[in-house]
């Protein structure tokens, strides 16, 4: 049996209470499919992620992806208002903070893109098996997260573009407190090896994200 405390927001000062009596708890009020709502989750995720542990999970709420209902819950169905780039950002942030992944849409109505978001094994491994997850860098328009891969040597690195314009982002490993000179980079959303580097970089669309595995050489 799983006890999920909902809705939120759960006060972070009561984390020991939640860990003792529940397996998951909502970190926010109902999360819906809008960029302002998604952007607000970054600060909550950063605060809660270091406090998660097996059997006690901060919950960023269900995934409003694919064909979903409206807040009035009168049976109407529509496609999510999040752009495809924002949907990638949502899945990347939820996975990097190790939130429970609970689909909030009409599963039989999924299109190929929505299904690809939910079934990417390399991304799901981040949510299910990473550790040490935390926000490692923030500027006015960009955020980076870092986590340990299961073997404790490799790192997962996520880059997020919070701005309304496309931008090229680059962060040195030293800025992310990754103590290696170089690593072999792999883009987990694109299933593409990128070669060796001493930094993480990507051209990110507005509100977009990228997720990498850095394998220590």
Model-derived regions: residue spans:
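Loop/turn elements at helix/coil->beta-strand transitions in domains of secreted/extracellular proteins
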Residues: 1-2, 153
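Glycan-recognition surfaces
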Residues: 2-102
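Flexible loop/turn segments at secondary-structure boundaries
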Residues: 10-13, 72, 103-104, 110-114, ...
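Catalytic cores of secreted or luminal carbohydrate-active enzymes
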Residues: 89-137
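Carbohydrate-binding surface patches
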Residues: 94-97, 102-104, 138-178
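Hydrophobic, well-ordered secondary-structure elements that form the walls
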Residues: 157, 185, 207
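Solvent-exposed beta-hairpin/edge-strand motifs
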Residues: 174-190
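C-terminal beta-strand-rich structural cap/linker in extracellular carbohydrate-active enzymes
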Residues: 195-217
């Amino acid at each position: 049996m799983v006890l999920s405390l909902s809705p939120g927001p759960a006060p972070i000062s009561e984390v020991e209470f939640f860990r003792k009596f529940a397996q998951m708890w909502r970190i926010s009020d109902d999360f819906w499919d809008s960029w302002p709502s998604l952007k607000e989750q970054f600060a909550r995720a950063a605060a809660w992620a270091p406090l998660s542990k097996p059997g006690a999970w901060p919950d960023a709420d269900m995934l409003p992806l694919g064909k979903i209902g409206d807040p009035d819950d009168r049976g109407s169905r529509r496609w999510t208002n999040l752009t495809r780039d924002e949907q990638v950002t949502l899945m990347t942030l939820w996975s990097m903070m190790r939130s429970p992944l609970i689909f909030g849409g009409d599963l039989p109505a999924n299109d190929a893109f929505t299904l690809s978001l939910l079934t990417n094994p390399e991304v799901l491994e981040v949510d299910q098996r990473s550790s040490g997850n935390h926000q490692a860098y923030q500027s006015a328009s960009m955020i980076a997260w870092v986590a340990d891969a299961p073997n404790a040597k490799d790192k997962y690195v996520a880059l997020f573009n919070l701005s309304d314009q496309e931008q090229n982002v680059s962060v040195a490993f030293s800025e992310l407190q990754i103590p290696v000179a170089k690593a072999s980079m792999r883009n987990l959303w694109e299933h593409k090896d990128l070669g060796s580097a001493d930094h993480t970089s990507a051209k990110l669309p507005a509100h977009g994200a990228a997720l990498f595995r850095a394998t220590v050489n």
